[in-house]
Regions:
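A conserved beta-strand->alpha-helix junction
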Residues: 54-91, 178, 182
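Active-site adenylate/phosphate-handling loop in enzymes that bind or generate adenylated species
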Residues: 85-86, 91-168, 220
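ATP-dependent adenylation/pyrophosphate-handling site
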Residues: 2-53, 186
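The feature marks non-catalytic terminal segments
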Residues: 171-223
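Structural beta-sheet core signal
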Residues: 9, 33-35, 78, 123, ...
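Generic secondary-structure signature for well-ordered alpha-helical cores
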Residues: 55-63, 114-115, 166-170, 188
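Short loop/turn motifs at secondary-structure junctions
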Residues: 29-30, 72, 117
């Protein structure tokens, strides 16, 4: 029996994640998209861009569109995380803010994955592009999910990713200011200290509690 390929996709509203989704659709994966919303810290633009890109896949008349209509879920899970992220703006943990953010996202992806029967977590991460995506931090991030990681863009140059987005039609939909760093530090750490991360999360109420509290306010957007 061929194992069904099911993943949870963390879709941010930026340029990279729709490209990652498209690559995995072409590889035959069934995809359940998740968007972690930072409203009201930010505006609704990130969610709007996420919805626009996913609907584009479902509507285009092309081989990619055919794959999306077959394997991309028409339900986008939106999870508000602003309250949880604001806890990591204190002086004692702010330099690790982006790592805590991605760890939280992985924990939420894990929760959705359990419900959907997924085996993998898909991200648009690109090695070294930002602080949370250094080799020193990726391990500390992915340990918060039992799902295996799919990072199809990890070693691809950013300019190549932009060209890929342009060629498939999502680049314009994803343009706009990056909002994930709204509360982020000016000098983020590039090498995580796991013991300190865990102590900071415990001080903020405990990692599992942060995940559960964020999940209480999740909603479903029909694509």
């Amino acid at each position: 029996m061929v194992e069904q390929k099911v993943c949870i996709a963390l879709v941010s509203g930026g340029i990279d994640s729709p490209v990652a989704v498209a690559r995995m659709l072409r590889e035959g994966w069934s995809i359940h998209p998740v968007h972690c919303s930072q409203e009201p810290i930010t505006g609704p633009e990130a969610e709007q861009k996420t919805i626009a890109a996913l609907r584009y896949f479902l509507e285009i008349e092309s081989p990619l569109g055919d794959l999306a209509r077959q394997n991309l879920s028409r339900e986008l899970t939106v999870i508000p995380v602003a309250q949880q992220l604001s806890l990591f703006t204190e002086k004692w943990c702010h330099t690790e803010y982006f790592i805590h953010m991605k760890r939280l996202y992985c924990g939420l992806g894990d929760l959705v994955g359990t419900q959907k029967g997924a085996t993998h977590l898909l991200t648009g991460e690109n090695l070294g592009q930002v602080s949370s995506q250094t080799l020193g931090n990726l391990g500390a991030i992915e340990m918060m999910t039992s799902l295996r990681m799919l990072r199809p863009l990890l070693g691809i140059d950013k300019t190549v990713i932009m060209h890929m987005a342009q060629s498939m039609g999502t680049y314009e939909l994803s343009l706009g200011p990056e909002v994930c760093d709204a509360l982020g530090p000016s000098l983020p750490t590039t090498v995580a200290n796991l013991e300190w991360l865990e102590k900071s999360e415990e001080r903020a109420g405990g990692f599992q509690n942060l995940v559960e509290e964020a999940w209480k306010n999740h909603r479903i957007v029909q694509l």
